[in-house]
Amino acid sequence: MEPITVIGGGLAGTEAAWQIARAGLPVVLYEMRPQVASPAHHTAELAELVCSNSFGAKASDRATGLLHHELRALGSLIIATADRHQVPAGGALAVDRAHFSRELTETLENHPLVTVRREELPHLPESGIVVLATGPLTSEALSADLQCFTGLDYLSFFDAASPIVVGESINREVAFLASRYDRGEAAYLNCPFSAEEYQRFWQALCEAKQAPLKDFERENAQFFEACLPVEELARRGVDTLRFGPLKPVGLRDPRTGERPYAVAQLRQEDRHGQLWNLVGFQTNLRWGEQQRVFRMIPGLEQAEFVRMGVMHRNTFLNAPKLLKASLQFRDRPTLLAAGQITGTEGYTAAAAGGWLAGTNAARLARGLAPLVLPPTTMAGALFHYISTAESKTFQPMPPNFGILPPLEQPVRQKALRYAAYRDRALKDLSTWATAMSLPLQPLALDGCDPAAVEAGA
């Protein structure tokens, strides 16, 4: 049988290659390091953790923790290895990064069905089953080839994403639903500022601390010229925002009947109205600063952020246009994608993408139908989101409870709601796996800590 090709030896590619070999099929894993250097990597190991050593919260009533549990049940190599190399980190799953990557490298290099080739693939293979898992720093040559394959508008090279907040955390006594001049459907939540509120917000925004750029981002400042951070707009003058993204024209505050001094608008991100995007708030502020400053917006005092604003180098596909929820390309079903290049964020999401793409690559090789995970699971919700989101405004998304379908019976208390999401996800995963004849590993669930959840810990 012709080997399956996996391009990229990060978390997603490593997981994908393992799942293919686990299915008893030969796989060739291409990793360009150390022959071709990456601006962010420091070793030649597979699955090197280039940023934090943390896989996020461990508790099953947190979004990332639920994804950990799902992947443990599904037999993820990445999560199993992370569990073996844990270091103390409070409620987070953090690892000894050197031992973690070294074990994964040795595991794949010593597997009889895995061939690791240390060379760059400048072009997508024209035939065979292929998993693309090249990550946010895809090489220039392969990026150019991907642009030719997908079309110039369907591959991005940097994130310029605004924060997203949970709809239930927005104060609807202050924020009001309307469109400018009442044209068409009332599509935006509008947060009205008084002159005093705007002045305080503008001052805090100008003084807020920005996240430092990495060396390779600083050297390529053109990535940021097309989409100026909101804090840079603010520094151009006190009225720049008020005549730009915070302009109040065409809107009236229903509490006063008057036009506000300024207005911050939020646009619905999902069909259920659970997630709302701060329009025009692409930012490079530190995450703690974003929460502090953006909670000064009237109506967002208690806002729960599920994605922070980012601006950084990141190669990713316009997944809603290109990918199915099975992670297959719509126009070439034998080509699959996994990891950050699909528009998911975080180590655990990358492992989940590697699991699904690798599993489906093996199924395609055996003539079986590809899998689509239930959208009520965290993994399934992620892949459903990236394959169905609005393509014109698509930006990468981390695991969060806001992308899950609403519960049949609404639960007001956050801790109980998250626990209900978890219970439904794991139940539906078990039912689905049984129907698909997939073995699941037994899970030992941790307890839910309502106080920690309500506090946002």
UniProtKB/Swiss-Prot annotation:
It is found in: Cytoplasm. Its EC number is 2.1.1.74. FAD binds at G8, G9, G10, L11, A12, G13. Its main location: cytoplasm. It catalyses: uridine(54) in tRNA + (6R)-5,10-methylene-5,6,7,8-tetrahydrofolate + NADH + H(+) = 5-methyluridine(54) in tRNA + (6S)-5,6,7,8-tetrahydrofolate + NAD(+); uridine(54) in tRNA + (6R)-5,10-methylene-5,6,7,8-tetrahydrofolate + NADPH + H(+) = 5-methyluridine(54) in tRNA + (6S)-5,6,7,8-tetrahydrofolate + NADP(+). GO terms for molecular function: flavin adenine dinucleotide binding; tRNA (uracil(54)-C5)-methyltransferase activity, 5,10-methylenetetrahydrofolate-dependent. GO terms for cellular component: cytosol. Keywords: Cytoplasm, FAD, Flavoprotein, Methyltransferase, NAD, NADP, Transferase, tRNA processing. It comes from the Bacteria. PROSITE patterns: GIDA_2. The keyword Flavoprotein applies. Its cofactor is FAD. Catalyzes the folate-dependent formation of 5-methyl-uridine at position 54 (M-5-U54) in all tRNAs. This is Methylenetetrahydrofolate--tRNA-(uracil-5-)-methyltransferase TrmFO. It comes from Thermosynechococcus vestitus (strain NIES-2133 / IAM M-273 / BP-1).
